């Protein structure tokens, strides 16, 4: 049986590296690590036959069309903030484009990392996130809305951090 392929976006960040390390130690999955700068990955053996580094911008997913069609699970930790245009492009548009390139018959799970600032105490989306939140919070709320209406809705999980 072929090992599962797990895509981790933002794999050079703190959360992405932690997840990749955990998976290397606790699974036999192959990891596709999507990063802009592989030099920022300091805690993962990039020479492992189980690791494939995808170097590129999340806003240009067609570069990895073949790899994305093979993915079984997505752990989406990549994010942007600060520049409103880039924040929207990365946090909303790039996610939609990435989802469109996945092969629905292969995908078992999508884990979306976000912020607790978009949820109420019952884990429902806060309408205020759209109205009063920073562009970062607004784009995270919009992306969650998109995920909830996407074909992958039943396969998606939200992980929010404080």
Where are these regions (language model features)?
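N-terminal Rossmann NAD(P)H-binding glycine-rich loop of SDR-like oxidoreductase domains
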Residues: 4-29
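Conserved beta-loop-beta element that borders a ligand/cofactor-binding pocket
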Residues: 146-162
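Structural motif
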Residues: 5, 72-73, 109
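NAD(P)H-binding glycine-rich loop region in Rossmannoid oxidoreductase-like domains
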Residues: 47-97, 101, 119-127
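Conserved glycine-rich Rossmann-like NAD(P)H-binding loop of the short-chain dehydrogenase/reductase
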Residues: 27-39
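SDR active-site strand-loop-helix element
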Residues: 9, 34, 77-78, 110-116, ...
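Conserved Rossmann-like nucleotide-binding pocket used by diverse enzymes
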Residues: 7, 32, 54
């Amino acid at each position: 049986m072929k090992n599962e392929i797990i895509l981790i976006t933002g794999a050079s960040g703190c959360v992405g590296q932690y997840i990749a390390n955990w998976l290397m130690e606790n699974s036999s999955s192959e990891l596709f690590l999507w990063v802009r700068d592989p030099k920022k990955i300091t805690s993962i053996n990039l020479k492992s036959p189980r690791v494939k580094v995808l170097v590129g911008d999340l806003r240009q997913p067609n570069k990895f069309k073949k790899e994305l069609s093979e993915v079984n699970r997505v752990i989406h930790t990549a994010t942007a903030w600060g520049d409103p245009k880039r924040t929207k492009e990365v946090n909303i548009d790039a996610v939609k484009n990435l989802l469109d390139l996945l092969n629905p018959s292969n995908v078992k799970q999508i884990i979306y990392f976000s912020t607790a600032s978009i949820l109420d105490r019952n884990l429902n989306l806060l309408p205020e996130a759209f109205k009063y939140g920073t562009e970062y919070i607004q784009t995270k709320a919009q992306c969650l809305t998109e995920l909830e209406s996407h074909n992958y809705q039943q396969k998606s999980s939200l992980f929010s951090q404080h």
